[in-house]
Amino acid sequence: VPRCIYTDPEVAAVGLTEAQARETHGDDVKTGQFPFAAIARAAMYNDKTGFVKTIHAGPYDELVGVVVVGINATELINAGVIALDAEATIETVADSIAAHPTLAEGLKEAGLVALGRPIHLPPMKRRAASA
């Protein structure tokens, strides 16, 4: 069940938090966080505050949680709901195709960050994201 907070910025989450995932899966947890500042559509809205975070765990790196903070977070979380229901893996999320420019690209990009291969981050942030 998605959890939504209608504030400015909006906050939405579904599934496990990172802390809950670590309690359940120990060190077998990967996360990817992608800033709205790197999404062209956020710049078009003139609101680059926020991020999308994916939480993956287990031997197959299954998606176990999604957090979205920022503009339209309460709408974007629905993609996370579908991915969780489908038991999507980190690869499935990262290899998905999103329309461009959209805020929804953040989910795919967060998956790519978790895999250490982000597309739309500067080289310095790429190194930090994969560390």
Tell where the protein language model's regions lie, with residue ranges.
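Flexible, glycine-rich terminal cap/loop adjacent to redox cofactors
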Residues: 5-131
